[in-house]
């Protein structure tokens, strides 16, 4: 697998729940690893009356005060500035892509069809005998990746996900009975 930093950006979203149809997209973060350029943007509450995930992502209703909807001009600039039309967008799980797709659809924003996502969590195979310990944080600790934090900010998660992607080095992981096996590609 190609690990050239200039071929990727990392996307992380913070949300108000797990349903991209019922829960708000609270923030969007995009990290360009070769330049270390970072985009981090709060969005207003629309679908929910309050923020229910503050203990996970640290985002409060006060943080969102004055936040504005994403505009088509901002989307176009983001696609251009972060070269999203030519880079693969890395995500750790399918939630990020799903929330972006449904936000674009709800707001009538164009450009989602230009984006190419790769959910590298698909390279991690875990059995039902793993005891629920296969978290991004635990994998980062296993690979000695620093700066794992209790609060999951989009900006920090983007950097952690990039470091984890590099450490996996294109290998698939098999996790069973709390043991981790790297499988060669």
What are these regions (language model features)?
Residues 2-3, 142, 162-185:
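Acidic two-metal-ion nuclease catalytic site recognized across multiple nuclease folds
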Residues 15-17, 122, 160:
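Short, glycine/acidic-enriched loop or turn micro-motifs at the edges of active sites
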Residues 99-103, 119, 160:
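Non-catalytic alpha-helical scaffold/packing segments enriched in small hydrophobic residues
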Residues 131, 146-147, 171:
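Substrate-binding/catalytic groove segments of enzymes
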């Amino acid at each position: 697998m190609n690990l050239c930093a200039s071929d990727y950006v990392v996307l992380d979203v913070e949300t108000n729940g797990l349903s991209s149809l019922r829960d708000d997209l609270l923030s969007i973060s995009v990290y360009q690893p070769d330049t270390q350029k970072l985009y981090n943007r709060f969005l207003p509450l629309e679908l929910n009356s309050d923020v229910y995930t503050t203990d996970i992502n640290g985002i409060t209703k006060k943080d969102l005060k004055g936040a504005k909807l994403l505009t088509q001009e901002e989307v176009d600039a983001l696609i251009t500035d972060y070269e999203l039309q030519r880079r693969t967008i890395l995500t750790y799980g399918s939630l990020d892509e799903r929330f972006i797709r449904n936000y674009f659809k709800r707001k009538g924003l164009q450009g989602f069809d230009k984006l190419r996502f790769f959910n590298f969590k698909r390279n991690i195979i875990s059995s039902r005998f793993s005891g629920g310990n296969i978290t991004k944080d635990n994998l980062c600790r296993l690979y000695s990746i620093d700066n794992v934090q209790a609060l999951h900010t989009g900006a920090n998660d983007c950097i952690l996900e990039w470091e984890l992607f590099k450490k996996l080095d294109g290998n698939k992981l098999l996790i069973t009975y709390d043991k981790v096996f790297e499988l060669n590609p």
